């Protein structure tokens, strides 16, 4: 959700000085004034914890916010007044909501689309091509937001997204739909990233956690609204309105951003044309893009369209490893012109927030995918009703995300919430993995709510970490890295869960119902399960199906636990100034 760290990270750097408490933004301003006569490189960072404050000589930890002239954001900057901020927030929220809606609205429309285009074999592409292009260009947009005006890069990304949506809605063929989804994915990769950057330039740091949580919570709203809107459009109007709705939202966003958001100057001067081209690390991208496409295709196809041991999947993995290895070497040589600089990789706040985001988002997507499958297969409900039965988790995520954002602004620190999120979500995930066919509402409502509360505590925190702990000059690239890793986490976790589900289902069927055609059962899907299984074998098949789903839940639980590893390195930095 997007688009998330924590312990008392006490650095071991030499020549450190000890302080007695965590530092605030104003404390750092005072320190900066006192040392203004000294020559201090802006890339050095002051590491703080509840018990210590250190200034390491290396640049692995970038200086937190609070400085003005040395490249970090200063909270003394002017922000839009209340009514301008309200208009900007409406525009940003509509853009993020339509982008998130595009991930969920298509599911209930696919049967009608495949009937019209007679394109059942293309269904996999409808779902995979959008996140594929979205993930690949996120880091590129990080560079664009660094060297060009935030307003115009954002509006350009929005325009590409809306063009893709219009192509999807107007296309006369399945191929056109796939192309439109790919174009929309390209644009969406700059929308969420740009929305977070607009927030960082429009909202004071202390209030940013709440606003970030509000925007992030829209993913949960889209998770509920998407299938319902998709079903309504498909049944009462046309499936094409699943895509035509996006330009309506986009027009409002474009108008509000044009009128009310000041066009910020580029964070870095792009220089002349030749210098601009060199800053975009074209050599690195030449290896990165095909490497990521190979990896994501292998994760999408493995265990589904093709066996994991097939030559196609193995070839894709080998290709991705080779290309991404070359990309890493290129990044090492490119230094500050790299797509992912060594300074970013070494910064504990960046890699900690990225790892946390990878795990917590991965866990969320596993349960978002398999809880509706459990309701449809085990409880024998429709796709629409399964979405409603999934509300306890989604409402827990939305409400607790907003509450945690408010809490961070009040107490000043995001790290306690990042510690709590893996613990609470792991407990909830563990309870969800005990699901049985005879479980009633008290169990599936309560367990989902607990898990959703845990997720809500942490989902928005990685972006807050970046906004609070990273210099202004590096914020676009840092948010791009965290967002990119988030997308990758969802692809990896769902791929693992699908493989676990498939293997456990095959094992369970062989043990409980060997006469059932396993391949036919898997391709039938959860909603038609009872039509392809003989009545006398249904109970045994449901036992195997329930076991397969709960084993997939184990993957989500494991990702929740692993999120704590990402929380531990995060520095304790207050988002509050001195009152």
From Swiss-Prot:
One of its GO terms (cellular component) is plasma membrane. Disruption phenotype: Abolishes the production of 15-deoxyoxalicine B and accumulates decaturin C and 5-deoxyoxalicine A. SUPFAM superfamilies: MFS general substrate transporter (SSF103473). Keywords: Glycoprotein, Membrane, Peroxisome, Transmembrane, Transmembrane helix, Transport. Glycans are attached at residues 45, 380. It comes from the Eukaryota. One of its GO terms (molecular function) is transmembrane transporter activity. It is found in: Peroxisome membrane. The chain crosses the membrane at residues 85-105, 121-141, 159-179, 183-203, 214-234, 241-261, 282-302, 310-330, 355-375, 388-408, 411-431, 439-459, 479-501, 553-573. Residues 1-24, 36-54 have a biased composition (Polar residues). The keyword Transcription does not apply. It is a multi-pass membrane protein. It holds the Pfam family MFS_1. Residues 1-75 are annotated as: Disordered. Residues 25-35 have a biased composition (Basic and acidic residues). PROSITE patterns: MFS. The 15-deoxyoxalicine B cluster is a rare cluster that contains its own geranylgeranyl pyrophosphate synthase (olcC), in contrast to other related clusters which rely on a FPP/GGPP synthase localized outside of the cluster. MFS-type transporter; part of the gene cluster that mediates the biosynthesis of 15-deoxyoxalicine B. The first step of the pathway is the synthesis of nicotinyl-CoA from nicotinic acid by the nicotinic acid-CoA ligase olcI. Nicotinyl-CoA is then a substrate of polyketide synthase olcA to produce 4-hydroxy-6-(3-pyridinyl)-2H-pyran-2-one (HPPO) which is further prenylated by the polyprenyl transferase olcH to yield geranylgeranyl-HPPO. Geranylgeranyl pyrophosphate is provided by the cluster-specific geranylgeranyl pyrophosphate synthase olcC. Belongs to the major facilitator superfamily. TCR/Tet family. This is MFS-type transporter olcL.
């Amino acid at each position: 959700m997007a688009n998330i760290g924590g312990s008392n990270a006490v650095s071991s750097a030499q020549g450190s000085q000890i302080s007695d408490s965590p530092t605030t933004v104003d404390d750092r301003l005072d320190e900066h004034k006192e040392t203004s006569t000294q020559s201090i490189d802006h890339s050095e960072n002051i590491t703080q914890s509840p018990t210590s404050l250190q200034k390491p000589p290396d640049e692995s930890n970038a200086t937190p916010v609070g400085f003005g002239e040395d490249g970090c954001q200063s909270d003394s900057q002017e922000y839009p007044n209340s009514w301008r901020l309200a208009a900007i927030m409406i525009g940003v929220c509509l853009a993020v909501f339509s982008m998130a809606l595009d991930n969920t609205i298509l599911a209930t429309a696919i049967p009608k689309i495949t009937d019209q285009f007679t394109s059942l074999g293309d269904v996999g592409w409808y779902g995979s091509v959008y996140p594929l292009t979205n993930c690949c260009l996120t880091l590129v947009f990080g560079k664009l937001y660094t060297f060009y005006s935030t307003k115009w890069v954002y509006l350009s990304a929005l325009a590409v997204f809306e063009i893709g949506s219009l192509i999807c809605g107007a296309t006369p063929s399945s191929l056109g739909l796939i192309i439109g989804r790919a174009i929309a994915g390209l644009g969406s990769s700059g929308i969420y990233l740009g929305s977070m950057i607009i927030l960082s330039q429009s909202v004071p740091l202390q209030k940013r956690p709440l606003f970030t949580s509000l925007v992030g919570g829209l993913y949960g709203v889209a998770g509920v609204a998407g299938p319902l809107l998709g079903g309504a459009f498909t049944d009462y109007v046309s499936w094409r309105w699943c895509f035509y709705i996006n330009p309506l939202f986009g027009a409002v966003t474009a108008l509000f951003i044009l009128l009310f958001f000041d066009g910020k100057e580029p964070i870095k001067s792009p220089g002349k044309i030749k210098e601009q081209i060199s800053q975009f690390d074209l050599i690195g991208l030449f290896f990165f893009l095909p490497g990521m496409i190979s990896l994501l295709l292998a994760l999408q196809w493995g265990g589904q369209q093709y066996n994991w041991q097939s030559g196609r999947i193995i070839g894709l993995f080998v290709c991705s490893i080779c290309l991404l290895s070359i990309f890493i070497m290129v990044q090492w040589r490119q230094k500050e012109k790299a797509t992912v600089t060594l300074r970013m990789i070494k910064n504990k706040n960046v890699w900690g927030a990225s790892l946390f985001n990878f795990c917590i988002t991965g866990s969320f997507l596993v349960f978002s995918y398999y809880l509706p499958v459990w309701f449809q297969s085990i409880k024998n409900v429709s796709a629409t009703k399964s979405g409603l039965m999934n509300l306890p988790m989604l409402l827990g995520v939305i409400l607790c995300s907003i509450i945690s954002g408010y809490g961070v602004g009040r107490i000043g620190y995001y790290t306690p919430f990042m510690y709590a999120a893996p613990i609470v979500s792991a407990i909830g995930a563990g309870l969800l993995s005990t699901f049985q066919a005879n479980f009633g509402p008290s169990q599936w409502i309560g367990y989902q709510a607990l898990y959703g509360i845990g997720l809500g505590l942490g989902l928005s925190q990685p972006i807050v970490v970046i906004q609070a702990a990273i210099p202004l000059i590096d914020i676009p690239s840092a948010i791009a890295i965290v967002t990119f890793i988030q997308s990758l986490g969802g692809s990896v976790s769902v791929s693992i869960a699908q493989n676990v589900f498939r293997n456990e289902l095959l094992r369970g069927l062989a043990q409980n119902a060997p006469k059932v055609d396993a391949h036919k059962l898997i391709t039938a899907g959860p909603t038609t399960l009872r039509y392809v299984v003989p009545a006398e074998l249904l109970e045994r098949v449901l036992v195997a199906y329930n076991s397969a789903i709960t084993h997939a839940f184990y993957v989500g639980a494991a990702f929740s636990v692993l999120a704590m590893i990402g929380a531990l390195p995060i520095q304790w930095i207050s988002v509050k100034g001195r009152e």
